[in-house]
């Protein structure tokens, strides 16, 4: 964050690259200056970085506000959009820039409140609600589908070649894409009235065939998201009861998908999912491709927080949640992993064999976990062969929404329960 502050422009704009500056990603890249210090606080419960970086965050918000066209309400700092997404051109960048502007404001309201800046917290909360209302008003049509601002100078702007015919002005068009629904749902930006429609729309975009920007029809359960949408799609699916689709999306191996590069020999995460293919070699796609790039690896968060179910209960993980989500499609029969928290290793593992779900977990010393285990009834849950509620370090809390809920003290546990 120090490097980002070192190259922050006098306008308040964060550059895409630090510490050397430069770049053209706009709001979608610059928002790292807001999101990273907030996520660092949530992960480690250390407000020091947030306090130190807060003036730079506030300056960036002032910059974002200065980019708003008073006539349209849209930001002029929106370039790359859903970079390398198969339907990037179908959505455009204005939708995502507006979403991230609102998301940044929501974070600022929480950060200001945490740091005791009450006046700032109220100001940013009001700004957030205003931007969220604008987002729903402008980017959701009467049919409860999302819209994108399409056309104009393109993602890099500019005047074009001398004598060239200027492009038509941008216009709002239907943008019925995975990214639009995933981002709006994942960030919590859609209004309560719009949410049910957007959930159905997201499910439809995942389960159907979709045409990419080149007009090629891609198979069902293809990953039609780019750098921005990929970070939100699996979370949005699981949060809204569509974990079967999240797993189908995960396990598809046809292009575009997470597993496609693996079938082409990938041992790292590529910037382009087809940066190299067995059939065509590099095929020109390596002209702008990193073979060690984070963005499509954002699914790792979902694997940790949803498949394994390791989630923060409070900042810092002294209290955390274990909420495993076994694969309802039956294709994936086990998962195991861990997170090394400040208090020690949090381990979570599930396996489905026949009609039995086996779940094991490790809770570090000086922490407690709340376990949500899929179970038709609490009486069916066993820990090391005995009724779970009678096991040392296990306290039954309630049964809700098809899950038995327990509080776990530090220790290692082995649960079994019939599959529901």
Segment roles from a protein language model:
Residues 32-35, 52-59, 96-110, 119, ...:
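Generic recognition of stable, solvent-exposed alpha-helical segments in well-folded globular domains
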Residues 1-16, 23-24, 28-31, 42-99, ...:
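Active-site acid/base region of carbohydrate-active enzymes
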Residues 33-49, 100-118, 180-193, 232-241, ...:
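Well-ordered alpha-helical scaffold segments within catalytic/enzyme domains
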Residues 2, 6, 62, 66, ...:
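Generic alpha-helical structural context detector
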Residues 244-420:
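Non-catalytic C-terminal accessory modules of carbohydrate-active enzymes
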Residues 138-142, 172-288:
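Extracellular polysaccharide-recognition and catalytic grooves
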Residues 92-96, 220-221, 290-291:
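A short glycine-threonine-serine/GTX helix/turn-capping micro-motif
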